[in-house]
Amino acid sequence: MTRSVRQVFFAFAAFAALIGAANVPSARSLAAAPSDDQAVIAADRAFEKAVAQDPVALAMQTDPAFTWIDATGTLQSRQEILDAFGAGSAPQLVVLTTAVDVQLTTRVYGRLAFVQVHAGRGYSLRVFAKGKDGWRTLHVIELTQPAQAAAASATGAAVPSEEGVITECVNPCKLVPFTPATPAAKAAFADWREMEMGSLTRNMDLWGRHVLDDVLIVDSGGSGTISKAQRIANTLKQKQAGVRTNEVPPVLWARTLDFGDAVLLLMLQQPYKGQPYYAARIYVNRDGRYQMAVSYHTAIASVPDFALSKQLPAK
């Protein structure tokens, strides 16, 4: 099955599959040593260099579980990317650390870390995992925002790609087509679902409990980044206007990568209006619960917009 066919299959066929998950997190503190910050930065620069010219080095710089979601919304595995070098079709980063006016951010959470590289309309999130051989690239998600932001909808979606309709929330509020495999992954996934319940009900206290203060949300349908404060303000504006739409996109597919106090959540979601998108989120164990540290959304360009009038019923 080709990647494009596989993506369409997810978007059309997986929508009806529904199962659930929940659990309770452990509580441990996270602290990053300065040497870890520098090691992650060095790993990111080595990854950039390998992507540009050296598949052998790329294999050495990436984790066996490495995946890459490019700006078109194409998901590729490590082996697919290495094979693409031989075919002359290897993906290229949309923005480099050497770009003019680049904005760089590095965060380390135990054995999981990320580097954000932003310049112009290009946004790149590189996620790194620490193993016995040091830091290796685990995941990349990228996006390019439109030159001109789309006109605001009548309901003023809090996140541009998540515009909703008035309908019951079945997936993910009640049932989800995914069961995390480990206690930490179950806890992070359960806290993500509780965060989304806050979004659905426009209860920003509940939503905010599961979001770190320095979080950045980056959406391929938006313009710039969205801070925690801005996301809350967007939703409260909706609430004051009486907007009651469901802006919690159903989950079609998910994957978790568990690093104890930090968990990477990868999802394919279908908004009620618009294209399906891949999301990459990192959840960190703080204050006895998992909280979102970063969230990137990249629409799948090869799949047309959907316009769903209501949530599909639970089976």
Segments from the language model and where they lie:
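N-terminal secretory signal peptides that target proteins for export/translocation
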Residues: 1-6
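Bacterial N-terminal signal peptides
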Residues: 9-21
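Short, low-complexity N-terminal intrinsically disordered segments enriched in polar/charged residues
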Residues: 26-64, 138, 144-205, 209, ...
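Surface-exposed, charged secondary-structure patches
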Residues: 37-39, 80-122, 230-277
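Hydrophobic pocket/interface hotspot
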Residues: 57-59, 66, 81, 115, ...
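A mature extracytoplasmic/lumenal domain signature
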Residues: 62, 72-73, 118-120, 126, ...
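A short gly/proline-enriched turn/hairpin at secondary-structure junctions
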Residues: 65-76, 80, 88-93, 214-226, ...
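Short beta-strand edge/turn micro-motifs at domain boundaries
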Residues: 123-173, 276-306
